[in-house]
Amino acid sequence: MITLSLGVKLSGAVAVKVHSGEKGNQNFLRPEFWRPIVAEVHGTIVETNTAYGGMRDRTETHPRLMKEHGWSQYFDIDLMDSEGPDVIWPIPNGKVLKENHVGRHLMNYDSMLVLAHFKGHPMGGYGGAIK
């Protein structure tokens, strides 16, 4: 279904990046919605800790919030930056950014399906799929 629609076959270990929802926020697509897609690609739900305060900013509390929001009921979950140090990828010819820090667990995957959204924060930054 999804692989036919995209025209791409996701191979090997597949990471599925979602926005799992902040505490008290209902503005995220529920795990039940993503369940058939994740099953089709045999994926693992992946997330990263946030750079701003809240339950998603620490490895100790982030998994608990994902459980509260129902993610662990349906999926294996990998918090990609739960163990450090980050992997540093160079950005050749980058105008502003010269390198990108990514969670170490990203190296455990062969493919990634990004189901997270992109957004501009009122704090003057960007978030969602971009982080």
Language-model-detected regions and their locations in the chain:
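N-terminal and secondary-structure boundary signal
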Residues: M1-K131
